[in-house]
Regions:
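C-terminal capping/lid region of NAD(P)-dependent oxidoreductase domains
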Residues: 272-274, 288-304
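Conserved beta-strand positions in the Rossmann-like core of class I SAM-dependent methyltransferases
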Residues: 73, 170-172, 236
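Short amphipathic alpha-helix with an adjacent loop that forms part of the alpha/beta core around
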Residues: 194-207
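Mid-domain Rossmann-like dinucleotide-binding core that forms the NAD(H)/NADP(H) cofactor-binding site
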Residues: 123-192
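A glycine-/small-residue-rich N-terminal strand-loop-strand element
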Residues: 27, 69-93
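Glycine-rich phosphate-binding loop and adjacent beta-alpha segment
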Residues: 182, 215-274, 278-281, 304
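N-terminal glycine-rich beta->alpha transition that marks the start or flank
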Residues: 11-15, 20-69
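NAD(P)H dinucleotide-binding glycine-rich loop of Rossmann-like/cofactor-binding domains
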Residues: 74, 87-149
Length: 304
């Protein structure tokens, strides 16, 4: 029997329930995976709250969770892609808050050598989104990039990946996370009035930022981006909407192969994900409460 965390109606995280289910043997093209680590993302609590129902219509009961890492326990008939005992990363649309799941094989990526399950479970969403965004920005050696929300899961991954690309990073975060950004190698700037001027003050002699990744989508971040770029730079956002589009920010487009690419960076030691909380899977509701508060560092991990 597999344990799952699910919800039967939209609401706050406390609508989540814990139950068990019997999994069928995997059919053609399917693989059963025992999850060892499940990563929490802001999209999880937004899914439960109903904020995403326009884009992700659900049939209840529904199970949140889009990234995890674990071990293959069974494969479908005549399947040659993975074998029992293989360590893998899973990335799907939903269904990850489980101890074990039957998933399409094309949602799996081999676990890179030397990368543990918790680190691997952070790769698809935080790492993959950051990687896709920076590639979309065509970021390269010598560029200066501004990352809004640089202490969060996607932001902190982007700080490290940008440096692996040879770029210089200016990152916005709360006062409490300024030293953390320095430890990651970014030049930190606090939120609040005068943000664009503070960024100019640390960017370079000319005060030039030509690329922006916005992971927060606040009025302050959008205004600062518009003031800094003045229509001449490149900007992408992980929180697209009318306001960000009006400010000239494009939505991040996820790249094929991003999980494997970030996995390679992790195996090389060029990116390490900060785990802010480790909690049992059955405490997923509390984990989502923490996640939706924001201003955290890194990732929340559920341990099945």
């Amino acid at each position: 029997m597999s344990t799952r965390v699910y919800f039967e109606e939209y609401g706050d995280p406390q609508v989540l329930k814990v139950g068990t289910e019997k999994l069928a043997e995997p059919g053609d093209g399917l693989v059963r995976v025992e999850f060892r680590a499940v990563s929490v993302n802001p999209a999880d609590w937004k899914l439960v709250a109903g904020h995403l129902k326009k884009w992700v219509p659900l049939d209840f009961p529904a199970v949140p969770g889009s990234e995890a890492a674990g071990v293959v326990t069974a494969v479908g008939p005549a399947f040659e892609g993975f074998a029992v005992g293989d360590e893998v990363i899973w990335n799907g649309l939903l269904g990850g808050y489980r101890t074990e799941a039957v998933v399409p094989a094309d949602q799996l990526t081999p676990l890179p050598a030397g990368v543990d399950f918790e680190q691997a479970a952070c790769i698809p969403v935080a790492g993959g989104t950051a990687y896709s965004a920076l590639k979309q920005l065509n970021l390269g050696a010598g560029d200066t990039v501004l990352i809004h929300g640089a202490a969060g899961g996607v932001g902190s991954a982007a700080v490290q990946i940008a440096q692996a690309f040879g770029a210089r990073v200016v990152g916005t975060a709360s006062q409490a996370n300024q030293e953390y950004l320095r430890e990651l190698g970014a030049e930190p700037v606090t939120y609040g009035p005068g943000l664009a001027d503070r960024v100019r003050g640390v960017a370079d002699e000319a005060g030039t930022v030509m690329a922006v990744l916005d992971t927060v989508g606040t009025e302050d971040s959008l205004a600062a981006t518009a003031e800094l770029l003045q229509g001449n730079g490149r900007a992408v956002t992980t929180v697209p909407g009318e306001q960000s589009a009006a400010a000239g920010l494009a939505a991040v487009q996820q790249l094929e192969g991003r999980v494997a690419e970030v996995g390679t960076l992790a195996a090389e030691g060029q990116i390490t994900f900060t785990i802010s909380h480790r909690m049992p899977l059955i405490e997923a509701a509390d984990a989502l409460d923490i996640c939706r508060m924001g201003h955290g560092r890194g990732k929340i991990m559920l341990l099945p």
